Amino acid sequence: MGNQEYHEPVLADATTSLLVTRPGIYIDGTLGGGGHSLELLRRLDALDGESLLVGIDQDSYALEAAGQKLQDFGDKAILLRGNFSMVRELLAPVKRGPGEGLEVMGLLLDLGVSSFQIDTPVRGFSYLRDGPLDMRMDPDGPLTAADIVNDYEEQALARLFFRYGEEAHGGRIARAVVSARSVAPITTTGGLAEVVRRACPRKDSPIKTLSRIYQALRIEVNDELGVLQQALEDGFAVLSPGGRFAVISYHSLEDRIVKRFFSARCTADWGPKGLPLREPLKPAEAELVTRKSVQAGEAEVSRNPRARSARLRVIQKL
């Protein structure tokens, strides 16, 4: 797996400049090809003091590519296989070993699918490239998109397309899927794309509909929203005071979860309105570093179109 197969990291300069404040442990919970980690290591090298980069990814191919990209940094980078929702568990032996005595000063989650995964037909993420209907970010995961498309009942499919894809015609597309699979199982990305195209109303863009349907299936296969919520909880827990948490999201479902979590941590609890309290029942646990989400500029979007929908939010633990 060559490094060139992975995309340019989105919002790399903004993310790393906002995240790196002082030496310590920095966690890239979505390592991918190592683009963000490379920029983090370069910034950490410029600081006085000992630092350690911990990269996490559930995809063994990503770990291989990142390992090649970061090899010049030697033992300053530790790469671990696992889901970023397991950050607390994965970090524990690091804190007892090479990271002993270091505080966790930064955590990054880039929630996008890597271009390598999208562009590799056998991974089954894209409607533009025919391949097995898979969509597992962890190649060893138990559930595939084909399982969902061929086994879920029509009502469950419609609910899935509407909830995770925000697709207004989810019911219509679910009926088309059930009808098509009654003739023969739908086992390829191209086969599903053809079913969706035929079911898509003429006035609607088939590309946008396909994007929403494939997003819904990918979220379900990988339990992305549940994993994100767990990662936010555990990620914030492992941060040391003064540590920063940065998340890059790509669609409204993710961004709402991140925004709500960050807002809750940055808000003191004063109890019911009207209580004569001098101090909050529960003080704020963090403060906003970015008041609004940071977005890519025109120059970056022209170089890297996938940056167009990216939203970066950062908080600092108190």
From Swiss-Prot:
Signal sequence, start to end: none
Domain of life: Bacteria
Gene3D superfamilies according to UniProt: Putative methyltransferase TM0872, insert domain (1.10.150.170), Vaccinia Virus protein VP39 (3.40.50.150)
Pfam hit, one: Methyltransf_5
Entry-linked InterPro entries: RsmH (IPR002903), SAM-dep_MeTrfase_MraW_recog (IPR023397), SAM-dependent_MTases_sf (IPR029063)
GO cellular component, one term: cytoplasm
One Gene Ontology molecular-function label: rRNA (cytosine-N4-)-methyltransferase activity
Residues engaged in binding S-adenosyl-L-methionine: G34, G35, H36, D57, L91, D110, Q117
Catalyzed chemical reaction(s): cytidine(1402) in 16S rRNA + S-adenosyl-L-methionine = N(4)-methylcytidine(1402) in 16S rRNA + S-adenosyl-L-homocysteine + H(+)
Entry EC number(s): 2.1.1.199
Compartment list: Cytoplasm
Keywords: Cytoplasm, Methyltransferase, rRNA processing, S-adenosyl-L-methionine, Transferase
Main location: cytoplasm
Enzyme class: transferase
Gene Ontology biological-process annotations: rRNA base methylation
Family: Belongs to the methyltransferase superfamily. RsmH family.
HAMAP family hit by this protein: 16SrRNA_methyltr_H
Functional note: Specifically methylates the N4 position of cytidine in position 1402 (C1402) of 16S rRNA.
Name by which UniProt lists this protein: Ribosomal RNA small subunit methyltransferase H
Gene name tied to this protein: rsmH
